[in-house]
UniProtKB/Swiss-Prot annotation:
Binding partners and assembly: Part of the 50S ribosomal subunit. Contacts protein L32.
Stated name of the protein: Large ribosomal subunit protein bL17
GO cellular component: cytosolic large ribosomal subunit
UniProt entry keywords in alphabetical sequence: Ribonucleoprotein, Ribosomal protein
Statement: the UniProt record of this protein carries the keyword Cell wall biogenesis/degradation: no
GO molecular function: structural constituent of ribosome
GO terms (BP aspect): translation
Keyword field contains rRNA processing: no
Organism whose genome encodes this protein: Coxiella burnetii (strain CbuK_Q154)
Family that this chain belongs to: Belongs to the bacterial ribosomal protein bL17 family.
Length: 126
């Protein structure tokens, strides 16, 4: 039975899945918008949201916990100095998953994951 088992396996070993989600989280914090498959996007949300909540309080212990999950000093600094202060008043829901059609090769459902209060690019000057 598959009762009370949270999370998706994504057809990977646990080490591969953990590394993939870590890399995707680093990419999301770096670019603030990434495109991936829908199941990966939904799983990525479960990794990213607690990290932003952790980064709202800038302590050495929290920085070490974030570094333990991300393994990238520059991204941890960006998370604590740029990303978390933008979400200070928001009580959760820091990233948005938008459906983005289907991939050409295998018709996998695609999604865009973006941080909610990200700086808009120059293309949207309304």
């Amino acid at each position: 039975m598959h009762h009370r088992k949270s999370g998706r396996h994504l057809n990977r070993t646990s080490a591969h899945r953990k590394a993939m989600l870590r890399n995707m989280a680093v990419s999301l914090f770096q670019h603030e918008l990434i495109k991936t498959t829908l199941p990966k996007a939904k799983e990525l949300r479960r990794v990213v949201e607690p990290l932003i909540t952790l980064a709202k309080e800038d302590t050495v212990a929290n920085r070490r916990l974030a570094f333990n999950r991300l393994r990238d000093d520059a991204i941890v600094t960006k998370l604590f100095k740029e990303i978390a202060p933008r979400h200070k008043e928001r009580p959760g829901g820091y990233c948005r998953v938008l459906k983005y059609g289907f991939r050409n090769g295998d018709s996998a459902p695609m999604a865009i994951v973006e941080l909610v209060d990200r700086e808009e690019s120059e293309s949207s000057e309304d």
